[in-house]
Each structure stands twice: as structure tokens, then as C-alpha cells.
Amino acid sequence: MRLTRPSLVSAASIAAVAALALSACGGGDSATEASASSSAASSSRLVVATTVSPITSIVSAVAGDNVTIEGIVPEGTNSHTFEPEPQAAELLNKADLIFINGLKLEDPTLQLAEANKKEGAEIVELGTIVLPESEYIYDFSFPEEDGKPNPHLWTDPGYAVTYADIVRQKLTERDPANAAEYQANFEAFKAEADKLAAAVSADQASVPQGQLKLVTYHDAYAYFAKNFGWEVVGAIQPSSFDEPTPAEVTGLIEQIRSQGVPTIFGSEVFPSAVLEAIAAETGVRYEDSLRDDDLPGAPGEAQHSLLELLRYNYRTMISGLGGQPTQLDALVFERTVPDTAFYPQ
């Protein structure tokens, strides 16, 4: 599995791109402008920009083929440290709607969007809308003193449905002619997400009592764990997203031993020699195949979706903790909406 390195763009670059975008809008060949104006007038198709692949997948599931959807954050990238290429400003300048997670996850992309969005465009921070501050989760990877709560709501299928409903509302406001289709697509997505939640609830009951405990590379399951009755013991990736200090490693080893954690979970997207060494030191099983935000399959394939990603990760965790994921294995998603979104790789 590839490991995509984040690109870097400075605040000065953001300002320069914004200036270029403004000058491009105000100048240029009149024939070119007339052609562009004619092209825009001839098409009422919405243009939507998204950030991480789970959000792109949700938007696509609701929008169907009525909307042009393009993601910004490549799959397999650490979304917390990702900074967009300056050319992302061009997409953001064309978009009618810009869907991001919010909760401080994509601040550089948000800054670029605010500097370059066209008049009338809307930036929709899904997580910030959904989660009241009283329900923010702060922990070892997201300490409260840093002011950035854990942003990973979409790993819980219930929150994924709430995201999808907001997407439906925003698309309907912009494109009321297709409101019935957006509603039908949302209801189909909700039905599949509800089946997934039911399968997880059934299968986690097969995990030996007291073993629904998570130690992961990336701290992505806090809201899922809270709502499904799991315990997040720790994560190897600290708030700085650098390698953990020796003291942090020692503390995590002590937690694993004292709480009887049976398995620790790494990521096939972000291999961790430190987590592997912790497993060897504690003698617990090491399962290194969680996919984080990297959707399975290739864009356009049926398995390339958020729900399939969640099914895969839930299955990996339940089996790794000694359970039997029989309901997850038997689950068949009835995908009727084509995914025509662009997912950067």
C-alpha cells in the first residue's frame, strides 16, 4: 500500500494563489471569457469540492451523477498534516459547495478555500455542524489544551448518516429540481449504514468479555468506541503526529499490560516500527492491516466506499480481538448510485 507524503504550501503561497485567482477573474481575453460564460450558462450542474475520501464517498452516495465531485486530499495521506497544492485553489474557485470535515482537521485547506471560493459558494464543515462542543472528545492524541478535538466522526455509521443528511440538505438548496433523487439516495445510504451498524453490534457480542479494547496507530475510533461500548486504551501517534517519545512508549506499554489488551492494531497505510516493537515487548498480537481513510478497491469499483471501508476495519478489529465477524462477512451492500467522484491518489 502506498504512503503518500503531504505537499507543503506556505501562507504566502495561499495569498499569492488568491491574488492570481482574482486577477484571472478580472482580466484575460474577452473571447475566452465569453466562451467560459457561455459554457457555464449552458450547464446547471453543480461543482462540489471535498477533502478526505470518506467525505467524498458520502457526498457521492447522495449526489449520484447529478453533480461534479472532486476530492482534494489524496487517499493514503495523513489528513491532519496534509497541506494542499496551490493548484487546488482552481478547484475551490469553481466549486458551488465545499464539503470539509471541520473540527480543525483540514485547516490549511479551509484557509485556501476561504481565500479562493467564488461569490455565493458555501463552505460546509460537516463535523462542526453535527457535534456540539459539549460532545467533543479530547484525549492523548487530541489534548484539550491544543484546542483541536478528535475529528473522526465518520468512523461511526450513525455520524456518517448525519453527514449524509446535511449533504442532502445542501444539495437540495442548490439544486431543488433533483431534490427527490437526493432524498432517495440519502435514504438508500441510511439503510445500508443502518445494516452495517446492526452487523457490528451483533458481531462484537462474540468478542470475549472485557476485550473490546483498542490500541491503534491512529486515534480514529473514539466516537465509534463511545457509541458502541468499546474502550480506546491508547494510540501510538501523539498529538504532534511525530514519533512518540520513549516516555510515551513506556506509558502505553504499561497500559497494555495493566488492561490486558489482547491485540494492537497498526495501519497498512502508515507502517509503524514502534507499534510492532511494542507488540513484541508486551507479547500481544499485532494486526497491521487497518486502512484508516484509504478506501478499499479502486475508484469506481463497488468496494471503493466509506461503508466498505468501515466494514473492513470493523471486521479486522472484531476478529483481532477474538470475535467472529459473521454478520459483517455476510453483509451485502446494495449500491445503486454510481460513484463518479474524482479521488486523488
Q: Where are the regions that the model predicts?
A:
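Extracytoplasmic metal-acquisition and chelation regions
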Residues: 2-14, 21-345
